[in-house]
Amino acid sequence: MGKCRAQSGAMCPSYQVTQEERYSTRGRAHLLHEMVRGEVIKDGWNNKDIADSFEHCLSCKACKTECPTQVDIATYKAEFMAAHYANKRRPVSHYPLAYIGNLLPKLSRFSGLVNMLQSGIIGKLAQHVLGLSSEKGLPKLAPQSFTNWAKKNAFRQDPQFYRFGAQDQPMVVLWADSVNNHYRPQLLQSAVNVLLKSGHQVAVAKQHFCCGRPLYEYGFLAQALKQLTLILDG
């Protein structure tokens, strides 16, 4: 379909950069189709070409909305990656990227040191290990996470939440996602101010919860399910 090879819109970013069919929505769908048929691709879940194709998928889900058939390549990617690496060693880069939600709270405690190290040879080595482009540097951690800001500025607190606003106002729970919590806390701070001015009280969880999406994207399905269960129990 023509939209799979479009030069504008959101679908598909990996094709728009590489101009290679195997990195398009259509290309990935065809590879999976051939895998299921088993005539051309005979090694099933172990096929390295399909794995390479999905490694370049950003899991942005643009195909879910822009593709006429609403194919959800991101979901197929998660399932394929889980099966492909079930019995083989993963690339080293998968682990820090998949577990970034667990790593960031620890790294943010030493944000100044981490940011300084990123600027030198260690930063370049980290980019190489993570498989990131050398054209742009690693993002800088904020001096203070949103959760720490909430701890210092909350109107009151209880065992689970830092709370802002009057107790007789409707309550909104503001989930501090991993990226905004540690890289762009000012966005969440602004969200608190907007909610307060709109007549709400705001609750911010004391414990940081990663949504589990990075785990899911890399095919760590069991770990992602465990993370979601932890969130629901929390």
Per-region residue spans from a language model:
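Iron-sulfur cluster-binding cysteine motifs and their immediate structural context
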Residues: 1-34, 62-82
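Alpha-helix capping/termination and helix-coil
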Residues: 2, 36-40, 199
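Gly-rich Lys/Arg/Thr-decorated short loops/hinges at beta-loop-alpha junctions or inter-strand turns
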Residues: 31-32, 36, 213-216
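Iron-sulfur-cluster electron-transfer modules
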Residues: 41-234
